[in-house]
A protein has these predicted regions:
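Short histidine/acidic/glycine/proline-rich micro-motifs that form metal-
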Residues: 61-66, 89, 133-134, 156-161, ...
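Catalytic grooves of carbohydrate-active enzymes
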Residues: 174, 178-217
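His/Asp/Glu-enriched short active-site or ligand-binding loop at hydrolase and phosphoryl-transfer sites
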Residues: 134, 139-176, 210-217
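Soluble non-cytosolic domains of exported or imported proteins
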Residues: 37-41, 105-108, 193, 197
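CE4/NodB-like, metal-dependent polysaccharide N-deacetylase domain
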Residues: 47-58, 82, 100-137, 141-146, ...
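Conserved strand-to-helix beginnings and helix N-cap segments that scaffold or border functional pockets
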Residues: 43-44, 70, 140, 163-166, ...
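Active-site beta->alpha N-cap acidic-glycine motif
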Residues: 3-95, 99, 123, 212
Length: 217
């Protein structure tokens, strides 16, 4: 099944240098990110584990899931984590990125759920992660003109992949993470089993090594 890379090559990062792939720092800092939430299955578990380690993270939320789980979403905010836009429905393919309807002047269409809710809770929603990392240059240009930062990653946990073991998912993170890494997890139903196994171990492992888990500003 594997059609993904767990460690983003430097060449790709250099070619698409207008996107944020990682943070260059000598400090022991890691940036955990969670896509596709909030969900009733796993997001509250994630928040609880983060709190145990005084860890901050960034949640790239889907509009429809915010609408379906408003209390959990408010908990993300009240715990002082960062919020990013992951579109309205997380549909695959350039033409289906409807959350921020990229076509013409409709780029702000995501206000129907995500942006409108966030506006009252967090003044500047300026972090965006395209579903599956797929985005056209024209789309990216339009987003940047609106002040958005496009946040990618340099470490992919692959917690969404049901064909790999929990241990392999953990190894994907531990073998590839360095200072300033942006790591992708998913607080989704599909990733629940792996995330419950991996996240506590990642938090404990790097906390013992003196790392700080930071939210993307």
């Amino acid at each position: 099944m594997k059609l993904y890379i767990t460690k983003t090559p430097r060449l790709i990062q250099q070619i698409f240098k207008n996107y944020t792939w990682r943070f260059f720092t000598d400090k022991k800092e890691i940036y955990l990110t969670f896509d596709d939430g909030p969900t009733s299955e796993i997001t509250e578990f994630v928040l609880s584990e983060l709190k145990k380690h005084n860890a901050k993270a960034t949640f790239f939320c889907i509009g429809k899931n915010i609408k379906n789980n408003p209390k959990i979403f408010e908990k993300i905010i009240s715990d002082n984590h960062s919020i990013g836009n992951h579109t309205q429905n997380n549909l695959q393919g350039f033409q289906n990125l409807v959350g921020l309807n990229y076509k013409n002047e409709k780029v702000k269409a995501n206000e129907n759920t995500t942006y409108k809710v966030l506006k009252t809770l967090q003044e500047n929603l300026k972090l965006f992660r395209p579903p599956y990392g797929k985005i056209k240059k024209s789309q990216a240009k339009k987003l940047r003109s609106l002040g958005f930062k496009i946040i990618m990653w340099d470490v992919l946990s692959a917690d969404f992949d049901t064909s790999i073991t929990n241990q392999k998912c953990l190894e994907n993170v531990l073998k590839n993470t360095t200072n300033g890494s942006i790591i992708v997890f998913h607080d989704s139903k599909k990733a629940t089993e792996k995330l419950k196994f991996v996240l506590p171990k990642v938090l404990e492992y790097y906390s013992k090594k003196g790392f700080v888990f930071k939210a993307i500003a």
